[in-house]
Amino acid sequence: MDVCDAWKRESPKQKSRVEGLAKDSGKLVSAEKLKVVWSEMLKSEVVPDAESVSRIINSYGSIGDFDMISKILRLIQLKDAEILHDIFRLTISCFGKRGQLECMDCIIKEMVSLGYSVDSATGNAYVLYYSSFGTLAEVEVAYGRLKRSRILLEGEGIRAISFAYIKENKFYALGKFLRNVGLCRRDVGNLIWNLLLLSYAADFKMKSLQREFVRMVEAGFRPDLNTFNVRALAFSKMSLLWDLHLSLEHMTHESVAPDLVTYGCVVDAYMDRRLARNLKFAFSKLNWNSAVSVLTDPLIFEAMGKGDFHSSSEVVLGNSTNEDWTYKRLIDIYLKKRFRSNQIFWNY
């Protein structure tokens, strides 16, 4: 009897057996043993579900037997083409999460050869996996394929590719990528603009940073906490106190609440200029008795690092069970610590 004709009846017992065989396949590394498992599944007279077939395919992928994968996919297409798209999706996801990019590419090629198109979810996942496990050059190729497919790169993909550039300190290339994605996209909020500002701030290109900030506002985008903190970190590291002060005023005008990063930028800038006594004036427009929070995008730290006050405060907060911390209290502790360290230095 033909295999396709045999898959007609299904009972809970048979289905359970098929699922058990599929799970067992994940533990096998021998092609011969896998063939035995696949043959048993065919004889069960049950059409395997997408997850079970995906397990078998992933097992074959781990030993590099793509001919067998192709045979399995074409057999499923003949019998139950409706589940084939789910099989592709699950298999691509499984290979991608394990960093088996070559296997993932082979599955996508097989998918296209069988007449299935790559949808938005699969295309974006493809880029994410390359961003996680591939080289920067491979990431750029993956994005190029997505772009040619006219699939819109979603926010998670934008962040992943941006992180790949940041890891390599390729800030100019990051800016080019973001412009290619499109600065006018509103479906991802301020993400693209904030990352563009970050690409200039990380290279301390202050004139370009200011110019693009003005363009962002003129384009109708309202600055958020990440926008202000990218600029504040750059101003702080460059000891541009007046620019930092103006940024805080703008922040207050926009009703954007500062976080630990914002306060840290001010503290570090004033401490570097030996102006600790002026901190009370610096915070006159802010409520430093408010509860501590850290809401800044972690990608910003990857590019700019964390300031001394921020890092020191995280240690204090991490070692404390008290949840009622204010910025003023953290600043007092930090100033005492710096005062003691300076005393020890001069005593030596």
Label each residue range with its predicted role:
Residues 120, 206, 217, 225, ...:
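Internal alpha-helical scaffold/solenoid segments in large eukaryotic proteins
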